[in-house]
UniProtKB/Swiss-Prot annotation:
Quaternary organization: Part of the 50S ribosomal subunit.
Membership in a protein family: Belongs to the universal ribosomal protein uL1 family.
GO molecular function annotations of the record: rRNA binding; structural constituent of ribosome; tRNA binding
Source organism phylogeny: Bacteria, Pseudomonadati, Pseudomonadota, Betaproteobacteria, Burkholderiales
Naturally occurring in which organism (per UniProt): Verminephrobacter eiseniae (strain EF01-2)
Encoding gene (name): rplA
Cited SUPFAM superfamilies: Ribosomal protein L1 (SSF56808)
Full protein name: Large ribosomal subunit protein uL1
GO BP: regulation of translation; translation
NCBIfam families: rplA_bact
Function per UniProt: Binds directly to 23S rRNA. The L1 stalk is quite mobile in the ribosome, and is involved in E site tRNA release. Protein L1 is also a translational repressor protein, it controls the translation of the L11 operon by binding to its mRNA.
Length: 231
């Protein structure tokens, strides 16, 4: 485990780990702790009231953050013919079929998101062992296997984030950058929470949004009172 810097230790002393902060107060602390020379990501961890080991309690989806992520997203699309042209017109960075598959097999993957038209899955399906571990395998549940490749490209470029609860029932996601004003970060978090609520499994019982914490890339975590978030 990496050692904390003097600034991180000082910030830890300012954060009461037993307290639930209002979102705006938590954001002040998180931004104060984001002292790196680059524009740190503001991230959220949400503990859900699910049993992630049960197949009927899998939480997975995607949402376009209304204020973007602050990151340039590079998009690759597996498509041919008219669909390939639609993807290019929408701003895809790389479009192809067998030629794109060859790039992937060679380890040449200059992209962050992979989208596929349904008829391209015969090619994409052979790349599962490469794309899967990198979190790049297209999936209809998050809208990356779709006949509307143009819309998928536009969503990815506009700041769409994919989310999935891990084995502990925790969802990790970015909601923007330190340079974002508080209103934009709050708007992005509200969109994420709304998407999580919409994907709540019917078999999930009790409180669904159990815990929430904010942090920056290099900063400390701050627990947030979920009641302080307006969706």
């Amino acid at each position: 485990m990496p050692q904390l810097t003097k600034k991180q230790k000082a910030m830890q002393g300012k954060v009461d780990s037993t307290r639930l902060y209002a979102f705006t107060d938590a954001l002040v602390l998180v931004k104060q702790a984001a002292t790196a020379k680059f524009d740190e990501s503001i991230d959220v961890a949400v503990q859900l009231g699910i049993d992630a080991k049960k197949s009927d309690q899998v939480v997975r989806g995607a949402v376009v953050l209304p204020n973007g992520t602050g990151k340039i997203t590079r998009v690759a699309v597996f498509a041919q013919g008219a669909k390939a042209e639609e993807a290019k017109a929408a701003g895809a960075d790389v479009v192809g079929m067998d030629d794109l598959a060859a790039m992937v097999k060679a380890g040449d993957m200059p992209f962050d998101v992979v989208i596929a038209a349904p008829d391209a899955m015969r090619v994409v399906g052979t790349l599962g062992q490469i794309l899967g571990p990198r979190g790049l395998m297209p999936n209809p549940k998050v809208g990356t296997v779709t006949p509307d490749v143009a819309l998928a490209v536009k969503n990815a470029k506009a700041g769409q984030v994919q989310f999935r609860a891990n084995k502990a029932g925790i969802v990790h996601s970015t909601i923007g950058r330190r340079s974002f004003d508080d209103a934009k970060l709050q708007g992005n978090l509200a969109a994420l929470i709304d998407a999580l609520n919409k994907t709540k499994p019917a078999s999930s019982k009790g409180q669904y949004l159990r815990k929430l914490a904010l942090s920056s890339t290099m900063g400390v975590g701050v627990r947030v009172d979920t009641q302080s978030i307006t969706v």
